[in-house]
């Protein structure tokens, strides 16, 4: 009997490591089933033995069977064959490795070329013990230089190079053969060997082509020891196996033939290839046998080599691709594996799945947010396997009867033996009788849990759990709010739905992935969903000031509010008629005690300060106190997706379920209001008034005129270029500015003209659709169209379109659209507009692919990073990435933005607000009540405590300002203290005007105690203490400053009670916010970074400002950072200055000049070469004067200079700009050319700055002829010098820095923040230099540069200059810049995790294949990313082992990955199991089929030996739930109970738990310690275990499933498995924690035949009991299980037996002979007289029977108020462990106990039994039965021990 829940398959073991290796020829033969030797496939229409479709290799067609394993098409996995190659060939995948190994070993003797005892080799072996790949690389580096086999040491003829090698000294023994080694080269798929010239080999050619055969011989000689040294493995991967001698032929299942109708079979590509190989192989064998010429054989071998190579890889560079006849390239094995569609990524990492549906989505605002409307057709098609149990058998039977055609029905029944019954084709489904243990695949029904998903799945909120609601028609319906996390809209989007197939999965989705649980995203700690669309628009309209609702409409709205408590609020206006405001309606929707302060979107900032800041004239301050909307218009700022808004607060304060309902209620109520109120939009809304249009036209006319002026200026050269820009750029920037200004101005005037009631405006203001710019484009003017960030470029000759004149730079021709959408665009405007739009589309398409790849890489790099149980963040190799997640160990979901009250204020304010002065009596009396003042004055340590608090606060402030030197950090911490204080004030009704009774000493001690409880890192060693201090530092600072004594008594005014509540609340919230172990934070971080990247715009924006510097931003920059690219697009330094240079622009300019690279070219005006033979009398007129002066005192020999002259004229303006002098330049020239060039130059103040250079020639004494030649060369030479000087002569600066811009920042982020003497923050605008190009090291060494703040944006450079920690911070800063540039925000912990992953190893790991795949993770993970086949080949060569720890590996192997709920094991406490309670597994119909299948075979279980009624029963064992062992309703149960009858506590053997055949024995609580029902064995005073003892009552407050007394049905016990189909969490009738109720117990199930409350005398195990036998009496002597007439299959024992029907009349509830089979105990049936509340021995008021008493020890043993005959030693007087208040018959939630049930009318005198499983039709319990009547004297609600409010019996539970 297999486990229920597993179709009958072989049990699977988990793979815990994967060993890679190469298949050796022997192994291939051993695993082969067929020797393939013929290329043919069929012979005479039959598959040919030994052919390529050998029937031993697998099944060929659907009807066939496999000859090896006799399986059919679905069962047979296929079997390998083999084919032997005539000659060995290279394996193309191992060719480069073979080459490397050849170079490491001797070509003749196969020894290693270096000595293993060499210290360097030893060192390598030691270093690379776990890394064979690295070992080969290092050994190869040592070997490749060797040209002789080692050990030629003692040859006489002084051999080259290695004699003097220190490694050879003192070595005498010859290790190798001493022969020369060839050098090897790979050509295509051949290897060539070549020897050096001096080789004295026996007349051998110097160059040969190495055959695979020869290489094989070399490899075979390598010893095992050497194999290990070269990083291979003698067992799994020997070098000789890298050469193919035997090829495995893949099974048929891998290469199925494609059968096309009507034509022949098309064979698979692999089959084609194999047939080529076989043909070539046969030809080679034939030729070899016939003794063909050598070159013929060589050609054959090469052909064979080619075919074998292209079988593996068909994309080898330098080889023709193998093709089919049609010319299509064949798909080789390598192509099958690699890429997105390949085996690994396409079939192992991601698969197509069953039980999924896909259709279009539509909106339905009336559904709750976690519900999805599913079309009936889909619901009828998707099924859920439900296990039949006695509780749901009738319900499922009903579904089975309906079959597959009607909804709701069922599709299949799966019997216990795994047989499937398809109800679609079953002739009479109604005849199929279900038995417990069967599985019914029923249709999806309302309330099922599903997973809903929309691609692209960018973050975890793209797959969420929903509940099903079956609706008509064919689309998925979903709530509008849920569209935003899915990023869905209803313009035709499709979504996928997956129906989980096990209860475990359902439980997991329900507890982790449901929509309400994902309301807040950890990405940015804010809600992911808000109110959208019409509801948002309406909520703003409804909460405006003048919205009134009359009585009927109010009633109508209240009807839409499910949480309405029945009280109509007081109307705001009473006369003339009652009217409610919209705000009041909104207040009704707000749940609970919520306090929020927000602003409306139109809130003017000026209102926040000033005398009237409490009054909001425009009603723009949204104030919600205690769940009442007091003021303000609600818009998207309050109910949108922003952090800290109403939805966020509700979710944090009141939990996810209430928040989810809040979303739904807002929508239902407000849509109902909108439906009546209406909202529309039409052309009327787009029309402004006449004056506005005039205004707009004037603005545009003026703008055009301005542009014309600028063009004029540019033409006349009056336009000054801005620094760093050319004239043209400056002009364009100016024009752009004018035109954008014009658009904005027209837009704002258009908006001003719109009235408050304009519908466009109402949508924009509420935030539901559109923005200001949309309005202005519709009404005023569309504005400038841009392409690539510039105006429309000239496309025709010097113009944009043919209708414009050439060189028209005016607004119209360059794409300014002056019309509005309303007015309509002219054709040329339309064309330009289309150009702009097209660019956007292209951009989006390109961006999607880019960011998709970035996201994939991020995920792959971080997929296995998770929080461990020790709180650290580690990857799959257990390498630490972070000590605590996010450095504070908190989950991103529970933190909020908070501000530090002590950071900003200056010293005076700080002291005023935070310093408590206990000596100031006036202050104390004003703020504290008398007794507190007295306490303060009496306390000895009061003053010192308060003083220590103040010094702590000062220290905190100092630290804060050190941590956040800018004073503006966005601090995210859990527990929003301001709001908690506000809540406390509301809950405890704090009066802010009264003095408080909260002692400051109590505050200080309370806060200190609390901060000790906030533990992130536990442990007492120094490191743990330091880590704990670091992790909680900010939280503690916040706590101490917010909850300081001064604040508490002045602003918060909490009383002692409220303060204590506050501390408790903070502690709870903090604990809740700690990150959960198992949380996959890596994937989360990758998604949180990838998702905003997708929203980023791709192209780089050039923002024109003061600094005209271009900065790469957006996706390209993100790529640069995570690729760690060496070549940045725009490398740049930001140089901060110190001292005078920072303040004084002139000094700053000095530094700039020092940095900026200046060549001669930059300062040169023009150059010329003259022939000027006489130096003194120059031919250049303007130079004459100064040259003659210069030569009056010649400083060098004029005779030797060349007649050719290079004259350079410099630009004075630039010289001054660069702070250069002529002297400096002359020095540079002299430095560069020395004595070869004569230079004379003008003075710095001369009119023109001129340099004259001549080449210093030889003496003039040479002949004229030669001179002429020289002269010719001179001028050419001069030309070269000129070119060289202009470009290469560095005058000053750093060559890498091409340009430096100088600017003074106007925003705070670049300013220097200083702390003033008063203690406030002040931003100082220093001069900043920004450079193009970087040279950080050089710049840092310059003077007047602030070395601390100067940074580079090139992370590689920072790494080289400043090291790994600096680069970590730098990456974080750069990433943050990229993300925050377009206003996104990502929580710090995600960025930090990425930075840590990139730098954890001490070097920069790029997020590319070069970084990710160079980690030491398993080969399977690496191959799932990129370079699939190469990695697998490498792994097999080095015989790597994959430990299968990561996520990818487990997914490939189909195992549960060690992450999330899979990252821990559950351990069974065997000791506890001894106290378990056994459920008889074998009472019904044939073994414990519902016991989760733990019972053995039916026959064994039913054998009489296992059910001893009276046979040899020891007193210690009492039958599981039944007072008599079996279910015998023996007379012994009559209240007069004879002690030796069947009910005697001493012989209740039942299925004794120790019975060897009973697998559940181990769990049985009835071991001797807890045995029997007799007082001797189980005395009421036993402290241990009774079902109603508080330890064991699930509803009892002290009951916890982990309680030591309880291990019965805890989730760890095998009999209780959430996946057991009978255990349905939604089952109303049972409490899963009730140990006495095991859902899987057969004996206890209302629908189980053995336990039918309506058949008193029916015991399924009684052989003599045939339901139709009239003479059968429960006390019949023939009732013995050993009776031969009893057989479970006997016809009389049939569940369908006519009289065994739940309505069987033979059952009378008061039958004394019937021991009611109450679900948790046959012994307890409320309607059975044996247990009658009025029975003296069982009286609830008896002190001994107290459901809450831990021991049943009566306080006075003989006293029982209503039981005169009560005797504490009576075996009856124990509270039966079988009776549990949570048992279904006795549980208000049980179907058989429903107050609304017709039978349960307290006045119902009669009691009609009716089918057991319909809720509310209990057969056991009639409230009016005298034995159990609330009016019965012994059961009085006032009875202390048994009152309905007693914790164990709670009607609400």
UniProtKB/Swiss-Prot annotation:
SUPFAM superfamilies: beta and beta-prime subunits of DNA dependent RNA-polymerase (SSF64484). GO terms for biological process: transcription by RNA polymerase II. It comes from the Eukaryota. SMART domains: RPOLA_N. Mg(2+) 2 binds at residues 489, 491. Residues 827-839 are annotated as: Bridging helix. Belongs to the RNA polymerase beta' chain family. The C-terminal domain (CTD) serves as a platform for assembly of factors that regulate transcription initiation, elongation, termination and mRNA processing. DNA-dependent RNA polymerase catalyzes the transcription of DNA into RNA using the four ribonucleoside triphosphates as substrates. Largest and catalytic component of RNA polymerase II which synthesizes mRNA precursors and many functional non-coding RNAs. Forms the polymerase active center together with the second largest subunit. Pol II is the central component of the basal RNA polymerase II transcription machinery. It is composed of mobile elements that move relative to each other. This is DNA-directed RNA polymerase II subunit RPB1. It comes from Caenorhabditis briggsae. The lineage of its organism: Eukaryota, Metazoa, Ecdysozoa, Nematoda, Chromadorea.
């Amino acid at each position: 009997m297999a486990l229920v829940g597993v179709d009958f398959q072989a049990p699977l073991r988990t793979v815990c490591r994967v060993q890679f290796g190469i298949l050796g020829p022997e192994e291939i033969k051993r695993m082969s089933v067929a020797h393939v030797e013929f290329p043919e496939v069929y012979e005479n229409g039959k598959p040919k033995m030994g052919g390529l479709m050998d029937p031993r290799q697998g099944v060929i067609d659907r009807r066939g069977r496999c000859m090896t394993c006799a399986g059919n098409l679905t069962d047979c996995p296929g079997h390998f064959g083999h084919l032997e190659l005539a000659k060995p060939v290279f394996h193309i995948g191992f060719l480069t490795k073979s080459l490397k190994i050849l170079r490491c070993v001797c070509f003749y003797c196969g020894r290693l070329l270096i000595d293993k005892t060499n210290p360097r080799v030893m060192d390598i072996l030691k270093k690379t013990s776990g890394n064979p790949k690295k070992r080969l690389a290092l050994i190869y580096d040592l070997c490749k230089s060797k040209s002789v086999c080692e050990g030629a040491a003692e040859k006489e003829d002084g051999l080259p190079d290695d004699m003097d090698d220190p490694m050879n000294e003192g070595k005498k023994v010859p290790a190798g053969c001493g022969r020369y080694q060839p050098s090897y080269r790979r050509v295509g798929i051949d290897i060539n060997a070549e020897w050096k010239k001096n080789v004295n080999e026996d007349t051998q050619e110097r160059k040969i082509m190495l055959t695979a055969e020869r290489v094989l011989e070399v490899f075979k000689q390598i010893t095992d020891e050497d194999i290990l040294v070269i990083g291979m493995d003698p067992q799994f991967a020997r070098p000789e196996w890298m050469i193919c001698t035997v090829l495995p032929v893949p099974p048929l299942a891998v290469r199925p033939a494609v059968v096309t109708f009507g034509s022949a079979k098309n064979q698979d590509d692999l089959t084609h290839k194999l047939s080529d190989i076989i043909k070539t192989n046969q030809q080679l064998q034939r030729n070899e046998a016939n003794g063909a010429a050598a070159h013929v054989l060589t050609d054959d071998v090469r052909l064979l080599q080619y075919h074998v190579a292209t079988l593996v890889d068909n994309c080898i560079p330098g080889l023709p691709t193998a093709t089919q006849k049609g010319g299509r390239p064949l798909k080789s094995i390598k192509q099958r594996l690699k890429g997105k569609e390949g085996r690994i990524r396409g079939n192992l990492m991601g698969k197509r799945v069953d039980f999924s549906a896909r259709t279009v989505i539509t909106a339905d605002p009336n559904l709750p947010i976690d519900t999805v409307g599913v079309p009936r057709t889909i619901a009828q098609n998707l099924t859920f396997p439900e296990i039949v149990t006695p509780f749901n058998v009738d319900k499922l039977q009903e579904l089975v009867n309906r079959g597959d055609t009607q909804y709701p029905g069922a599709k299949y029944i799966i019997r216990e033996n795994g047989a499937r019954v398809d109800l679609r084709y079953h002739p009479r489904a109604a005849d199929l009788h279900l038995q417990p243990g069967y599985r019914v695949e029923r249709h999806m029904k309302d309330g099922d849990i599903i997973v809903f998903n929309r691609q692209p799945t960018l973050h975890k909120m793209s797959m969420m759990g929903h509940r099903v609601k079956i609706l008509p028609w064919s689309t998925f319906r979903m709530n509008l709010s849920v569209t935003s996390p899915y990023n869905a809209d209803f313009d035709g989007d499709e979504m996928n739905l997956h129906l989980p197939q096990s209860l475990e999965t359902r439980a997991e989705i329900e507890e982790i992935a449901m929509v309400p649980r994902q309301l807040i995203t950890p990405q940015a700690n804010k809600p992911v969903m808000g109110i959208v669309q019409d509801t948002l628009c309406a909520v703003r309209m409804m909460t405006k000031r003048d919205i009134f609702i009359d009585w009927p409409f109010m009633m109508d709205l209240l009807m839409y509010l499910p949480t309405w408590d029945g009280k109509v609020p007081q109307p705001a206006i009473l006369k003339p008629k009652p009217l409610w405001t919209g705000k009041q309606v909104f207040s009704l929707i707000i749940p609970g005690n919520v306090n929020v302060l927000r602003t409306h979107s139109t809130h003017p900032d000026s209102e926040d300060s000033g005398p009237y800041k409490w009054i909001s004239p425009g009603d723009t301050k949204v104030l919600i106190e205690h769940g009442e909307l007091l003021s303000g218009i609600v818009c998207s700022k309050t109910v949108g997706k922003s952090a800290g808004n109403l939805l966020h607060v509700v979710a944090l304060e009141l939990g996810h379920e209430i928040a989810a309902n809040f979303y739904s209620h807002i929508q239902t109520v407000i849509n109902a209001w909108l439906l009546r109120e209406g909202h529309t939009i039409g052309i009327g809304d787009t029309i402004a008034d006449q004056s506005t249009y005039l205004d707009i036209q004037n603005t545009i006319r003026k703008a055009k005129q301005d542009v014309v002026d600028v063009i004029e200026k540019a033409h006349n050269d009056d336009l000054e270029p801005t620094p760093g820009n050319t004239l043209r750029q400056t002009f364009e920037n100016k024009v752009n500015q004018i035109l954008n200004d014009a658009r904005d101005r027209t837009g704002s005037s258009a908006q001003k003209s719109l009235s408050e009631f304009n519908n466009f405006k109402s949508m924009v203001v509420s935030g539901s659709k559109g923005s200001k710019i949309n309005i202005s484009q519709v009404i005023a003017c569309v504005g400038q169209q841009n392409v690539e960030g510039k105006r429309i470029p000239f496309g025709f000759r010097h113009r944009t379109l043919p209708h414009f004149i050439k060189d028209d730079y005016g607004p119209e021709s360059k794409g300014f659209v002056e019309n509005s959408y309303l007015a309509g665009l002219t054709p040329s405007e339309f064309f330009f507009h289309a150009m702009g739009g097209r660019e956007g589309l292209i951009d989006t398409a390109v961006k999607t692919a880019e960011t998709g790849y970035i996201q994939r890489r991020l995920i792959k790099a971080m997929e296995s990073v998770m929080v461990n149980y020790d709180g650290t963040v580690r990857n799959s190799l257990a390498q630490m990435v972070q000590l605590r997640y996010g450095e504070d160990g908190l989950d991103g979901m529970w933190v909020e933005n908070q501000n530090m009250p002590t950071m900003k204020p200056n010293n005076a304010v700080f002291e005023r607000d935070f310093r408590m002065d206990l000596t100031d009596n006036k202050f104390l009396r004003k703020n504290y009540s008398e007794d507190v003042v007295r306490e303060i004055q009496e306390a000895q340590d009061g003053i010192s405590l308060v003083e220590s608090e103040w010094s702590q606060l000062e220290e905190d402030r100092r630290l804060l300002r050190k941590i956040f030197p800018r004073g503006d950090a966005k601090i995210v911490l859990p527990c929003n203290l301001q709001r908690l204080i506000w809540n406390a004030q509301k809950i405890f009704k704090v009066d802010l005007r009264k003095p408080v009774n909260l002692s400051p000493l109590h505050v200080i001690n309370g806060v200190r105690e609390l901060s000790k409880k906030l533990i992130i890192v536990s442990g007492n060693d120094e490191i743990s203490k330091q880590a704990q201090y670091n992790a909680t530092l900010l939280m503690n600072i916040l706590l101490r400053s917010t909850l300081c004594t001064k604040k508490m008594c002045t602003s918060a005014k909490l009383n002692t009670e409220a303060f204590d509540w506050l501390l408790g609340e903070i502690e709870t919230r903090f604990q809740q916010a700690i990150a959960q172990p198992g949380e996959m934070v890596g994937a989360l971080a990758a998604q949180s970074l990838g998702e905003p990247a997708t929203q980023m715009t791709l192209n780089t924006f050039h923002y024109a400002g003061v600094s005209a510097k271009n900065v790469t931003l957006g996706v390209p920059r993100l790529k640069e950072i995570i690729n760690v690219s060496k070549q940045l697009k725009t490398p740049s330094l930001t140089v901060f200055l110190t001292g005078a240079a920072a303040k004084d622009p002139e000094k700053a300019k000095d530094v700039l000049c020092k940095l900026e690279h200046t060549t001669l070219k930059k300062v040169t005006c023009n150059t010329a070469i003259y022939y000027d033979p006489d130096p003194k009398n120059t031919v250049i007129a303007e130079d004459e004067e100064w040259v003659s002066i210069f030569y009056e005192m010649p400083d060098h020999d004029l005779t030797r200079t060349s007649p050719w002259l290079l004259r350079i004229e410099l630009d004075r303006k630039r010289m001054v700009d660069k702070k250069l002098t002529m002297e400096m330049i002359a020095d540079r020239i002299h430095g560069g050319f020395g004595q070869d060039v004569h230079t004379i130059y003008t003075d710095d103040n001369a009119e023109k700055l001129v340099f004259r250079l001549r080449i210093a020639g030889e003496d003039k004494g040479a002949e004229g002829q030669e001179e002429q030649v020289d002269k010719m060369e001179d001028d050419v030479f001069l030309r070269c010098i000129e070119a060289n000087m202009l470009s290469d002569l560095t005058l000053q600066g750093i060559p890498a820095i091409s340009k430096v811009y100088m600017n003074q920042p106007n925003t705070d982020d670049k300013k220097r923040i200083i702390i003033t003497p008063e203690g406030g923050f002040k931003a100082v605008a220093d001069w900043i230099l920004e450079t193009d190009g970087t040279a950080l090291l050089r710049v840092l060494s310059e003077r007047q540069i602030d070395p601390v703040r100067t940074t580079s944006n090139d992370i590689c450079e920072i790494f080289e200059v400043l090291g790994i920690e600096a680069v970590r911070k730098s990456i974080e800063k750069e990433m943050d810049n990229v993300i925050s540039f377009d206003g996104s925000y990502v929580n710090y912990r995600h960025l930090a995790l990425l930075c840590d992953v990139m730098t954890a190893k001490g070097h920069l790991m790029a997020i590319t294949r070069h970084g990710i795949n160079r980690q030491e993770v398993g080969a399977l993970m690496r191959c799932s990313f990129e370079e699939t086949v190469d990695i697998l080949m490498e792994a097999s060569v080095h015989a790597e082992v994959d430990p299968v720890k990561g996520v990818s590996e487990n997914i490939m192997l189909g195992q549960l990955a060690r992450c999330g709920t899979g990252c821990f094991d559950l351990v069974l406490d065997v000791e506890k199991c001894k106290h378990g309670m056994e459920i008889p597994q074998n009472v019904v119909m044939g073994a414990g089929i519902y016991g989760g299948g733990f019972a053995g075979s039916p026959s064994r279980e039913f054998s009489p030996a296992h059910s001893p009624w009276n046979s040899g029963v020891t007193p210690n064992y009492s039958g599981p739930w039944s007072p008599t062992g079996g279910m015998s309703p023996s007379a012994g149960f009559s209240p007069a109970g004879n002690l030796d009858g069947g009910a005697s506590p001493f012989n209740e053997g039942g299925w004794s738990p120790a019975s060897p055949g009973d697998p559940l024995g181990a769990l049985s609580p009835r071991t001797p310690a807890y045995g029997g029902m007799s007082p001797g064995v189980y005395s009421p005073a036993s402290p241990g275990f009774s079902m109603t003892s508080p330890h064991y009552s699930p509803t009892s407050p002290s009951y916890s499933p982990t309680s030591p007394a309880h291990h019965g049905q805890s989730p760890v016990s095998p009999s209780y498995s959430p996946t057991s189909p009978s255990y349905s969490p939604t089952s109303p009738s049972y409490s899963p924690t009730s140990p006495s109720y095991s859902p899987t117990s057969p004996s206890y199930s209302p629908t189980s035949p053995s336990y039918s409350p309506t058949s008193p005398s029916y015991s399924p195990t009684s052989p003599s009991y045939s339901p139709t036998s009239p003479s059968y009496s429960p006390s019949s002597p023939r009732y013995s299980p050993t009776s031969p007439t009893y057989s479970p299959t006997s016809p009389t024992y049939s569940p369908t037996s006519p009289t065994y029907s739940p309505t069987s009349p033979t059952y009378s509830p008061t039958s004394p002979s019937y021991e009611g089979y109450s679900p948790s105990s046959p012994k307890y049936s409320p309607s059975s007289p044996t247990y009658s509340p009025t029975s003296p021995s069982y009286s609830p008021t008896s002190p001994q029977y107290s459901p809450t008493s831990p021991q049943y020890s009566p306080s006075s043993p003989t006293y029982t108020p209503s039981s005169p005959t009560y005797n504490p030693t009576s075996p009856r007087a124990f509270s039966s462990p079988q009776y549990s208040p949570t048992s279904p018959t006795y549980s208000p939630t049980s179907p058989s106990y429903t107050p609304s049930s017709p039978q349960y009318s307290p006045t119902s005198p009669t009691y009609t039994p009716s089918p057991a499983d319909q809720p509310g039709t209990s057969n056991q319990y009639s409230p009016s039965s005298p034995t159990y009547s609330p009016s019965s004297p012994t059961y009085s609600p006032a009875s202390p021990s048994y009152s309905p409010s007693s914790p164990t019996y709670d009607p609400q539970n």
